[in-house]
Amino acid sequence: MGWSYIILFLVATATDVHSQVQLQQPGAELVKPGASVQLSCKASGHTFTNYWIHWVKQRPGQGLEWIGEINPNDGRSNYNEKFKNKATLTVDKSSSTAYMQLSSLTPEEFAVYYCARSDGYYDWFVYWGQGTLVTFSA
């Protein structure tokens, strides 16, 4: 009977740790066409440097587009070819925050931008930020 309780405790603890993972993003950014914007993604509930952070774009009525990923431990990054000259990914380890700078914004960049993280074992994204809507001011 003792082993059952130990296993139950370990499962409950692991589930609780998973439920604590958060990726916090601002709700919206208002920018002028041609300007640049820096989006943030503050991680908590896990060791920031252990997991790659991904960025994903979604335009209204369209599917998801993977922009790129960054390794918070050493700053290595990989980009979708389409976004290589548009997005720049960086991290600040001291604040457990990932950033994506978008330059020379056009109406094409009117979209919601999500940061995401895998569970560390598989490639799909288990944890998502709430997304930041980039809208344009006149």
UniProtKB/Swiss-Prot annotation:
Residues of the signal peptide: 1-20
Annotated S-S bridges: C41-C115
GO MF entries: antigen binding
GO cellular component: extracellular region; immunoglobulin complex
Region (Framework-2): 55-68
Pfam families assigned: V-set (PF07686)
Region (Framework-1): 21-49
BP terms from Gene Ontology: immunoglobulin mediated immune response
Stretches the record annotates as Complementarity-determining-2: 69-85
Stretches for region Complementarity-determining-1: 50-54
InterPro entries recorded: Ig-like_dom, Ig-like_dom_sf, Ig-like_fold, Ig_sub, Ig_V-set, IgHV
Region span, Framework-4: 128-138
Keyword annotations from UniProtKB, A to Z: Adaptive immunity, Disulfide bond, Immunity, Immunoglobulin, Signal
Region called Framework-3, residue ranges: 86-117
Chain segments carrying region Complementarity-determining-3: 118-127
PANTHER family (UniProt xref): IMMUNOGLOBULIN HEAVY CHAIN (PTHR23266)
Protein name: Ig heavy chain V region TEPC 1017
